[in-house]
Each structure stands twice: as structure tokens, then as C-alpha cells.
């Protein structure tokens, strides 16, 4: 029963995503390309944040003399 409820909720979120982004008007292959690009950009942003944020945080801490 819990799996069915989770699936229904996930389907509802996907439907809302399609409506908000107006992807329901696209053909399936266009939707696939758009979703692939969106996931790629999001993955690159997460990776960039993971790699470069510690350097920026340390620079800020050094600037405010929190860390020597």
C-alpha cells in the first residue's frame, strides 16, 4: 500500500513539473532532450559547488581573520 501511495505522489509531482514548465506540449523526444540538458546543468552546478565552495569559504574566513 505504501508503494502505491508513493508512486501516486511521485506521478503527481511529475505531472506538476510538466505543467509548470509547459513540457506537456513537447513531443517525447523533445522532452527527453530538455530533461537531459536540465539534469546536466544541475549536475555541473552541484559539482562546481562541491569543488570550489570550500576554497571560497576558506578565503572568506581568512579575510575576516576567523582562521589564520
From Swiss-Prot:
The chain crosses the membrane at residues 10-26, 32-54. It is found in: Endoplasmic reticulum membrane. Residues 27-31 are lumenal. The keyword Transcription regulation does not apply. Component of the serine palmitoyltransferase (SPT) complex, which is composed of SPTLC1, SPTLC2 or SPTLC3 and SPTSSA or SPTSSB. The heterodimer consisting of SPTLC1 and SPTLC2/SPTLC3 forms the catalytic core of the enzyme, while SPTSSA or SPTSSB subunits determine substrate specificity. SPT also interacts with ORMDL proteins, especially ORMDL3, which negatively regulate SPT activity in the presence of ceramides. It comes from Danio rerio (Zebrafish). Component of the serine palmitoyltransferase multisubunit enzyme (SPT) that catalyzes the initial and rate-limiting step in sphingolipid biosynthesis by condensing L-serine and activated acyl-CoA (most commonly palmitoyl-CoA) to form long-chain bases. The SPT complex is composed of SPTLC1, SPTLC2 or SPTLC3 and SPTSSA or SPTSSB. Within this complex, the heterodimer consisting of SPTLC1 and SPTLC2/SPTLC3 forms the catalytic core. Within the SPT complex, SPTSSA stimulates the catalytic activity and plays a role in substrate specificity, which depends upon the overall complex composition. This is Serine palmitoyltransferase small subunit A. The record marks 25 as: Within the serine palmitoyltransferase (SPT) complex, defines the length of the acyl chain-binding pocket, determining the acyl-CoA substrate preference. It is a multi-pass membrane protein. GO terms for cellular component: endoplasmic reticulum membrane; serine palmitoyltransferase complex. Pfam families: SPT_ssu-like (PF11779). One of its GO terms (biological process) is ceramide biosynthetic process. Residues 1-9, 55-68 are cytoplasmic.
Amino acid at each position: 500500500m505504501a508503494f502505491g501511495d508513493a508512486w501516486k505522489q511521485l506521478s503527481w509531482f511529475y505531472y506538476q513539473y510538466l505543467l509548470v514548465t509547459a513540457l506537456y506540449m513537447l513531443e517525447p523526444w523533445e522532452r527527453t532532450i530538455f530533461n537531459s540538458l536540465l539534469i546536466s546543468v544541475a549536475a555541473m552546478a552541484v559539482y562546481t559547488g562541491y569543488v570550489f565552495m570550500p576554497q571560497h569559504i576558506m578565503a572568506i574566513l581568512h579575510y575576516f581573520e576567523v582562521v589564520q
